[in-house]
Amino acid sequence: MTIAIRTTLDEPENHSDFVPHRPSRPEKTEPSKPFRLVSDYEPAGDQPQAISALCKDIQKGERDQVLLGVTGSGKTFTMAKVIEKLQRPSLILAPNKILAAQLYGEFKRFFPENAVEFFVSYYDYYQPEAYVPRTDTYIEKDSAINEAIDRMRHAATRSLLEREDVIIVASVSCLYGIGSVDTYSSMTFRLLKGQLVDQREIIRRLVALQYKRNEVAFGRGSFRVKGDTLEIFPSHYEDMAWRISFFGDEIEEISEFDPLTGVKIAKLDQIKIYANSHYVTPEPTLKAANNAIRRELDNRLREFKAEGKLLEAQRLEERTEFDLEMMAATGACSGIENYSRFLTGRAPGEPPPTLFEYLPDNALLFVDESHQTIPQINGMSRGDYRRKTTLADYGFRLPSCIDNRPLRFEEWNAMRPQTVYVSATPGPWELEQTGGVFVEQIIRPTGLVDPAIEVRPIEEQVDNLIFEAKKTAAAGWRSLVTTLTKRMAEDLTEYMYEAGLKVRYMHSDVETIERIELIRDLRLGVYDVLIGINLLREGLDIPECGLVAVLDADKEGFLRSETSLIQTIGRAARNAEGRVILYGDKITGSMARAMAETERRRIKQIAWNKAHNITPATVKRQVDDIVGHFGVVNSSEAAATIENHDPKVLARSISETEKEMLEAAANLEFEKAAQLRDVLHQLKRQELGLPPEKSSEIQGRSEAGRPGTRKTRSDKAREAKASKRVKQEAGEKLLRSRGH
């Protein structure tokens, strides 16, 4: 196997005749179930005609469709109905993690019997490798991986290879490279009851799949040996593991068990073990990659020396030789992604293998909030390319590092299956693909109409806002406020707090999980006002929102464009009493168009309600624990679910919660342990029969966005490093105390 090397830093453009990779996929081995949507509601309003039109055109083979659906019209329900009606696996593409998490929760409820999976970036913190020539500053890559999300990514790819009834909810990070389908699937292996196999051979294969032997801290992606018993914690499981019992070289029994209690859950006839990393590489490929990397290194060193760049040559040689030694010894190295093209055997400039290569041929793609998602896809590879060329120019990386990149727009466009673009404000590219034709979903099943809009002068806008926010809070509703800058959001939070309001801010410096918690706390009434910039827009489902205030609405630009204003206005459309205030001294073109479109929709919605004798009612939705899948405990709801059960059930719940709390503390997950402690207190209150008024009030979970808690990115980076160091030291101390 000979792998081509890169001799230039030029990025070849793919022409219109570009043909994407279509790797063969293994035969499905797990039984699949028909997609069956579980809901108390039937399609209403514009939903029936939208579902019918979309299904009809998909069956006719139309590659592109646009669903123009206003906020609260049930676009997610429409997508789910289309999937159920067509019985086809689907990928739901969201512009960010928050919306992806929200969609994941909804599809999980809609399809409890099917494989609904989550695929987003697994980085909690990520500082890419970079070099700044002007100041001669090298910035080393630094990151923190979220283990729960990594597990969900493995579960997603495994489901795509094993089942037909799969729905993947992903963010645009799915356009970045992962391991190739053929390598990832070919390195799996089966174990059968009664099979003759040497235990040492299984261990060798597990190590090749990047599983680690760990007799002390048995966790996901590890294995341990106890005499004739081998225990494996698969990469895609959260709280179950496999136990393989041998009699000599024969597999006597395979069972599934709880790794915490050791209790056997089920007996199995066979298991299929997938790799612990999407980037596993077979040994022959590693050797071929090693040879190709050396050839490219020699070629690049000759270029540097010919140009008199001796420092760059020395730097590149030392770094690359060290990486090659690490790969030869362990099969991996720090920054191995920069050699990803060698490991996949692809030619220079070819697209990397991504999640799209895992999709079956009959898959559907729904691009949610397409007006925001499509521009993201279009711009992802450009900034990445400039950073990588600088690293290669100054000898920090080989030229092939630029092949570790996200898909370019034209590559994604060629690879995507039949697509439905979903948005309240579709962009020009989507409408161009459909010739300006779209399916409209304006009428809401609830009869809610778009909110009334009022324009007020900027003079004394903050004091007026405080008055309106207090009035809204007194009525039992929440307020959303959008500003133009992070600094203004933080300063306004402090000012409104001093004015007696319960208020938080949310912007890009707030961690993803914290953002979800902030929205949950807002809905529960922990605080009444949330101030943001660009995050209080697409897809936020807050029926309790009674007021949306847009400060400096007449400052024409990206944050106050027609699309941005329509999306922001839509946040008040789930509440029958919702209203919008735009603060501006003049009405800009964007404001005029946004107000005109909102009024057009209002007229149509009011006419429908009148014709069908519908009285609009605020959406009633329980506050779901979206982040429950990320290992966070929802104390108030968790305790509430045990209410009215008999004493035996309550006692068992107390015992299980106490066990989970102790386990979390042992794993140094102190926040989770504290939350479980709160659940335990509430369960014990119920056991004692204390009345509800004696229970504690709803507590907020998010610590972010409080007045006076401004943090810069460097502050967060320091905190992440300090946290990582503390955990590492605690782990080492624990091992020393156990005599290891």
UniProtKB/Swiss-Prot annotation:
The keyword Endoplasmic reticulum does not apply. Residues 461-627 form the Helicase C-terminal domain. Residues 8-33, 712-740 have a biased composition (Basic and acidic residues). Keywords: ATP-binding, Cytoplasm, DNA damage, DNA excision, DNA repair, Excision nuclease, Nucleotide-binding, SOS response. One of its GO terms (molecular function) is ATP binding. Its main location: cytoplasm. PROSITE patterns: HELICASE_ATP_BIND_1, HELICASE_CTER, UVR. Residues 1-36, 687-740 are annotated as: Disordered. One of its GO terms (cellular component) is cytoplasm. The keyword DNA damage applies. GO terms for biological process: nucleotide-excision repair; SOS response. Residues 651-686 form the UVR domain. Residues 56-444 form the Helicase ATP-binding domain. A motif (Beta-hairpin) lies at residues 122-145. The UvrABC repair system catalyzes the recognition and processing of DNA lesions. A damage recognition complex composed of 2 UvrA and 2 UvrB subunits scans DNA for abnormalities. Upon binding of the UvrA(2)B(2) complex to a putative damaged site, the DNA wraps around one UvrB monomer. DNA wrap is dependent on ATP binding by UvrB and probably causes local melting of the DNA helix, facilitating insertion of UvrB beta-hairpin between the DNA strands. Then UvrB probes one DNA strand for the presence of a lesion. HAMAP family: UvrB. Forms a heterotetramer with UvrA during the search for lesions. Interacts with UvrC in an incision complex. The beta-hairpin motif is involved in DNA binding. This is UvrABC system protein B. It comes from Zymomonas mobilis subsp. mobilis (strain ATCC 31821 / ZM4 / CP4).
